[in-house]
């Protein structure tokens, strides 16, 4: 988390003026929008418990992808990365695509502007 935070801060500095940081800033011109994600949260929405690599099994990945309306991965697919990074990226991408079309996802409580917010949480609280 520490290393990722430091890398993220450097990237935010580099992207200053080129991207919107949601929910702190509103995207008014269809520019790049950066959102905070939490892959385990998206797996949980799909009723997959991301414990001890369970979420990286092909059947669990496909269950999660299907929940978000994405295609199945081919038989024999094995996610790469030391911490199942590819599995996390695949499901996060599917979740962002599926959730971003729902207007309620973009409407956050006032505290989110000061504290930040994980994309999809408020929607999920109403959904579950």
State the predicted function of each range.
Residues 1-128:
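RNase H-like (RuvC/DEDD) metal-dependent nuclease/polynucleotide-processing core
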């Amino acid at each position: 988390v520490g290393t990722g935070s430091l890398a993220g801060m450097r990237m935010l500095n580099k992207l200053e003026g080129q991207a919107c940081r949601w929910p702190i800033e509103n995207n008014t011109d269809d520019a790049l929008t950066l959102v905070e994600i939490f892959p385990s949260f998206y797996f949980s929405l799909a009723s997959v418990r991301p414990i001890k690599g369970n979420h990286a099994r092909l059947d669990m990945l496909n269950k999660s992808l299907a929940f978000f309306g994405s295609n199945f991965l081919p038989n024999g697919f094995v996610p790469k990365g030391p911490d199942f990074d590819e599995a996390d990226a695949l499901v996060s991408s599917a979740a962002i695509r599926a959730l971003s079309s729902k207007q309620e996802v973009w409407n956050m409580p006032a505290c989110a502007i000061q504290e930040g917010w994980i994309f999809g949480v408020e929607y999920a609280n109403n959904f579950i």
